[in-house]
Structure formats: C-alpha cells, structure tokens
C-alpha cells in the first residue's frame, strides 16, 4: 500500500500525531476521522477531517463567545485559529492540496488579518444554530461549515 494510506488500526495514532501542537477546542470536543473510518483512509483526507473538526469547533466557539459577549473566549478562539498557520500537520497538507489554504482564510478573517474569505466572499451576515443557540455569522465569514466540511458525518 502507498505510504499515504492510514489503516483502520493506525487511525487513532495518526489522529493523535495530527493534533500535536494544535490547541484543542473546549471540553466536550472529540477528534473523529472521516465517515467510514473503519475503512482504509488516505492521510490527506484523514487530516482534512481532523483539522476541519478542530477549525469548525473553534469557529463555533468564536461565534458563541461573540453571542455571549465574552471577549476572553472570543480572543482565545481567534488566537487558536490564527495559530493554525503553525500546526505541523496542516502545514504539511498545504504541499499536497488546497485544504490548508481554506482553513487559513477563515482563520485570517476571524483573527482580523483579512477582510473576507474567498469561500465567503462578501456575503451578508446570516443566522445559524450551534447546538441550541442561534448566532449571527458575520459578513465575510460566509458558509464556513460547507467550505470546511463541518457538516460531513464523522465516526469515532
């Protein structure tokens, strides 16, 4: 098998390796591989699923913190997302595809270093639900859940 293949028995260790040096979202978050993770997975797709989960969870936390008016939580989430430019596995992914660039666009918008994402364009703000809370997604962030694959089913 090619070196890029991650066998089912190796997925947990591969996920742990991908998360080294990555600030994890608040309690209750759990790393999951892609849907069908009982099957052999490509390293890139496994990494996209893991980093997508982390990124989406941090964006959710940022939105919930903004809704609650909790400046410290807003800052923590923005800093965690900004740090994505130094996540070793995500940096390695950038050499094999565009997924890391999408993560970094959202991170840059949320951390204030960029006005809008390519995926988000100049869309108007909209409301969405995170858990049981209705929040406003600001102009410029766009449909992060679709762009990052947040709504894709994942298995443990």
Q: Could you describe each region identified by the protein language model?
A:
Residues 1-7, 94-156:
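Extracellularly exposed regions in secreted/surface proteins, prominently low-complexity, repeat-rich
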Residues 32-122:
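Mature extracellular/secreted ectodomains of secretory-pathway proteins
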């Amino acid at each position: 098998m090619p070196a890029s293949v991650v066998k089912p028995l190796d997925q947990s260790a591969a996920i742990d390796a991908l998360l080294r040096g990555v600030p994890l979202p608040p309690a209750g978050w759990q790393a999951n591989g892609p849907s069908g993770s009982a099957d052999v997975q490509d390293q890139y797709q496994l990494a996209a699923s893991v980093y997508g989960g982390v990124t989406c969870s941090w964006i959710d936390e940022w939105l919930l913190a903004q809704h609650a008016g909790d400046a410290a939580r807003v800052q923590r989430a923005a800093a965690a997302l900004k740090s994505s430019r130094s996540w070793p596995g995500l940096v390695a992914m950038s050499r094999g595809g565009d997924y890391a660039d999408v993560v970094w666009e959202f991170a840059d918008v949320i951390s204030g270093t960029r006005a809008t994402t390519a995926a988000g364009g100049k869309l108007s703000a909209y409301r969405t639900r995170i858990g049981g809370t209705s929040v406003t997604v600001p102009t410029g962030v766009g449909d992060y859940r679709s762009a990052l694959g947040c709504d894709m089913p994942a298995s443990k």
